[in-house]
Amino acid sequence: FSFAPPKRGDYTVVAVSPEVKAEGESLPLRDVTKVVLHVQTQNGWDRRAVTSKASAVELSPLTRPYGLVGGMAFHVEADEPAEGDRKALAGIVIEAERYNATPPKELPPDEHVTRTARSSRSGAAVVTLTEPGWWGVTAVRERDKVQHRCTLWAFVDKQSTDK
């Protein structure tokens, strides 16, 4: 994969997987993964990137998904993919987990690993990204006997101690 941005601004890179049947799972899974590529100027990070009607859930950032520091609230919006007007998905579970390249020797309880919220009637949800690193914010919805999962990645910077 190669991408050369034609101009400054923000670009949403989207990857859509085919349906995959995972061992031990009752339904096949279709993944949509999104990340905002920032190129020198804040322009377009909040633009909706509708991936496909084949997906049953979309996540869009309501908080700029870069320039974040630990402890910030991160707002997202869950909706059903559609051209034109959006259809908010109320009550969808939104999970946030920090990526660890090397898992810790002892895992803390799941409730300390995965932050969980539900979307409001308008489809909005808030999670707190507590530590530096890459965070995956994910919504899952079942439709037509397929688990549809959309993950929006956001990077949390180390807080500067310089004054």
For the regions a protein language model found, what residue spans apply to each?
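Short, acidic Ser/Thr/Gly-rich low-complexity loop/linker segments typical of extracellular
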Residues: 107-122
